[in-house]
């Protein structure tokens, strides 16, 4: 099989979202064989494949080195599994020799050839293994802002600074709901009752299931729309580009940009590190604490490594409201953009809502056992 590490690896090591990653490539032979089995089974195998995407992946793909993978299988420390498609981009003038990448739970992971592994694109901090992060004085070296070409390159690398919540179409919500173990069990019970000529019971179960699915889909869609409206935000920000002040949409902010904060109230659209002036900030959206907090510039100390946890007083978090900013001497209130989009503190909260930790319900296991027992009884009864 070759070097095992080239076929699998670990990402986000030491973090709560640490995952083991496996590489897979499409196998024509396996795919044809699976489709033949699907036809012979009358399509019943589709349910199993939708419940467990990793099974479909293994039945249609072969294990391969991560560098050559078309899809990747991710296994978390909480026994969750995700199947993601690896995107192989075409080269451009700004991004020649682009490496492959994929998205998992709204986060981008890119292949780094020099270390032969995928790593998370999170912001200014270098996330490669062995990196010691950014020293605090580095933020002052960025005080003049980015060049337009550099900003455009980073925009293609990091993506737009937006937190977009998709509202799924109704038909997708219905399919996701009815393919769940509970409704499959209900369907199985209805079929058995129809076979035994208990039509009244079967019709009642069907009607109740339709009402239940409709109510669930309506509530899910309502909550998705409410979340989308709550997190969507955009404003016009003054940014330093090529040493000049220009007005840009907050969606165009990239890590390394220098933003100039106004004196009046404004909502932060990114995580940023304050390098000049003071700010009074309302962080109730993140912490629930109603008392305003004063933010001060980060120290210009090369021996200190920046950490959002340690340097909270120097960090302006996305989603928080700046009530008032006060310039120092003749300088404007400036901050260096540290993280954007779903990598921000606000983005992490939204991701926790969109992708909660899965719960292994004992009820589902019991449902499968019940279906198996009923299948045996029906088979015995028919014979």
Language model: regions and residue ranges:
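Hydrophobic alpha-helical segments characteristic of transmembrane helices
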Residues: 6-61, 162-234, 238, 353-383
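Cytosolic catalytic regions of P-type ion-transporting ATPases
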Residues: 97-115, 119-135, 235-365
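Membrane-cytosol interface motif
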Residues: 64-77, 231-246
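Extended, hydrophilic extramembrane loops/domains of integral membrane proteins
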Residues: 2-9, 141-162, 325-357
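Intrinsic-disorder signature of long, low-complexity extramembrane regions
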Residues: 1-147, 152-153, 207, 211, ...
């Amino acid at each position: 099989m070759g070097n095992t590490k080239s076929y699998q690896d670990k990402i986000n090591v030491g973090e709560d979202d640490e995952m083991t990653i496996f590489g897979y490539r499409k196998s024509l032979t396996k795919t044809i064989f699976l489709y033949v089995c699907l036809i012979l089974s009358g399509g019943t195998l589709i349910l199993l494949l939708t419940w467990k995407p990793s099974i479909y992946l293994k039945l249609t793909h072969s294990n391969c080195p991560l560098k050559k993978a078309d899809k990747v299988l991710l296994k978390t420390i909480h026994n969750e599994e995700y199947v993601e498609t690896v995107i192989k981009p075409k080269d451009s003038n700004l991004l020649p020799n682009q490496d492959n990448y994929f998205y998992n739970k709204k986060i981008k992971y890119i292949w780094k050839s020099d270390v032969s592994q995928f790593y998370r694109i999170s912001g200014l901090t270098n996330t490669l293994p062995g990196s010691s992060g950014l020293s605090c004085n580095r933020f002052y070296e960025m005080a003049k802002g980015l060049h337009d070409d550099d900003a455009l390159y980073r925009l293609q690398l990091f993506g737009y600074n937006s937190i977009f919540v998709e509202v799924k179409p109704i038909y997708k919500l219905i399919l996701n709901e009815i393919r769940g173990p509970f409704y499959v069990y209900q369907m199985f019970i209805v079929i058995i009752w129809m076979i035994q000529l208990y039509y009244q019971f079967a019709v009642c179960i069907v009607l109740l299931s339709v009402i239940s699915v409709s109510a669930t889909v309506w509530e899910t869609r309502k909550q998705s729309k409410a979340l989308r409206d709550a997190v969507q935000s955009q404003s016009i920000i003054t940014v330093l580009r090529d040493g000049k002040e220009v007005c840009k949409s907050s969606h165009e902010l990239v890590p390394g940009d220098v933003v100039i904060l106004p004196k009046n109230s404004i909502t932060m659209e990114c995580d940023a590190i304050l390098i000049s002036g003071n700010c009074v900030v309302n962080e109730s959206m993140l912490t629930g604490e109603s008392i305003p907090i004063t933010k001060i510039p980060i120290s210009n100390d090369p021996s200190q490594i920046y950490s959002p946890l340690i340097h909270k007083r120097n960090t302006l978090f996305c989603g928080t409201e700046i009530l008032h900013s006060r310039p120092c001497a003749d300088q404007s209130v400036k901050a260096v953009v540290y993280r954007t989009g779903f990598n921000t503190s606000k983005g992490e909260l939204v991701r926790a809502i969109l992708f909660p930790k899965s719960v292994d319900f004992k009820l589902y296991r019991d449902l499968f056992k019940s279906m198996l027992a009923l299948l045996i009884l029906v088979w015995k009864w028919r014979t």
